Design a protein with these regions (language model features):
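Core AdoMet radical
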Residues: 107-125, 138-154, 168-181, 192-209, ...
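Accessory C-terminal segments flanking Radical SAM cores
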Residues: 2-9, 14, 33-36, 305-374
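Surface-exposed amphipathic alpha-helices with a cationic face
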Residues: 103, 158-169, 190, 213-219, ...
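Non-catalytic positions within long, well-ordered alpha-helices that form the structural scaffold/packing
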Residues: 136-137, 187-193, 246
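Cysteine-centered iron-sulfur cluster-binding motifs in ferredoxin-type domains/subunits
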Residues: 90-100, 150
Length: 374
């Protein structure tokens, strides 16, 4: 049904008042998902308009979009989207800063430890000396990534395992907020064989010392990039320091569409939201900022790749991964971070007078107020 925005707001205000443990009845569920669909359709149409304004927009088999030289597109992203996926390796359960967009916001001091001397790969625990066994018994991934939480809290532990995967010819990338980088530890990572280092520049609002570390990293590591959630705060600080940032010699910017979970959602209450394919919930402005940066890169000829790491991209990533694993046609682990629709989060979207649905129809009989047994 093409529910009107007025009716959508009325029903979502009602649903937001219901007790969390009270399930919606079937007709109510239809109404709820009709509203989510109407919002998503309007946002998708806006995205198409913005993409049409980007010169020389490239796609990776329809799985994602980027601007810049296709030959410079990240091998880590290529592995994620067309290879064996992200292949996350976890070790460090601590972080030295607190970011409002962090998925572990409010829980950083109680993250489960991996264990002394151990590395977690897809729920299995290994010592460095076990990696040879793993490589000899399993299908080799096209790439691996070091995640969770800030690896530079104990970066001295990483070179040994990096050397193992380097010797096996497997592409490796790592994420960092950049605040603990030094010439010495960056050199050690480069010498061990790290292929990509990605800086979350939004974590520090584009701090000068982190920008300098990007330049230093480029001396030792083949590919150096920015990967950060797209927020108005990041966009503002990036524009203020754009020339200095681009002068570091970085190779690409991975524009992550900010998606929310119960931990970080409270930091963005009041922001217009939408949901992608009944999965990730995101501020509407996040991917729009990505498109603004992509257009700016193309028009100003930055000479780097700017990549749209959106909810759509992550949807494609999981389809690719499940297919590579031999999953059923259509199988995916892409899903919402919420047990039920966070109705309150969508009220700002429905209350925004500038946000319009593409089509509207009167509610059919049986779905109007008073028709449904509540």
């Amino acid at each position: 049904m093409k529910i009107s925005k007025k009716d959508a707001l009325m029903w979502f205000r009602f649903f937001a008042e219901l007790p969390e443990d009270e399930p919606l009845m079937p007709h109510q569920q239809e109404l709820a998902w009709a509203v989510i669909s109407q919002i998503e359709a309007a946002v998708d149409a806006r995205h198409k308009e913005l993409m049409a304004q980007i010169p020389d927009l490239h796609t990776l088999g329809g799985r994602t979009y980027f601007v810049g030289d296709p030959a410079k597109f990240s091998k880590g992203c290529t592995s994620c989207l067309t290879g064996t996926g992200l292949s996350a390796i976890r070790r460090t359960n601590k972080c030295n800063i607190r970011c409002p967009f962090c998925y572990n916001y409010g829980e950083l001091d109680c993250q489960e430890t991996i264990g002394e001397g151990l590395w977690e790969i897809v729920g299995t625990y290994f010592r460095v000396e076990d990696i040879d066994l793993l490589l000899s018994t399993s299908n080799r991934p096209t790439g691996v990534s070091y995640v969770y939480l800030e690896p530079f809290m104990e970066i001295e532990l990483y070179p040994d395992i990096i050397r193992k995967f380097r010797a096996a010819g497997i592409h490796q990338h790592m994420y960092t907020n950049g605040t603990l980088c030094t010439e010495e530890n960056l050199r050690a990572l480069g010498e061990a064989g790290l292929d990509e280092l990605r800086f979350n520049l939004g974590a520090t609002s584009c701090a000068d010392n982190v920008i300098q570390s990007i330049a230093t990293a480029k001396k030792y590591i083949p590919t150096v990039a920015i990967e950060t959630p797209m927020t108005p705060d990041f966009y503002e600080h990036f524009q203020q320091k754009k020339d200095v940032i681009l002068a570091t010699g970085l190779d690409f910017i991975n524009c992550a569409e900010l998606h929310l979970n119960p931990n970080n959602l409270p930091n963005y209450i009041g922001t217009p939201m939408y949901m992608t394919r009944r999965g990730y919930v995101s501020p509407i402005w996040s991917r729009e900022i990505t498109f603004r940066l992509m257009r700016q890169c193309a028009v100003e000829h930055w000479g780097i790749v700017v990549h749209d790491c959106s909810n759509h991209t992550k949807f494609a990533r999981d389809l690719n991964l499940r297919a590579k694993e031999g999953g059923w046609f259509g199988a995916s682990s892409y899903h919402s971070e919420f047990d039920q629709i966070p109705f309150e989060a969508f009220l700002p979207t429905l209350e925004d007078s500038d946000f319009r649905f593409l089509e509207e129809e009167p509610l059919p009989k049986g779905y109007r107020p008073g028709d449904i047994v509540l």
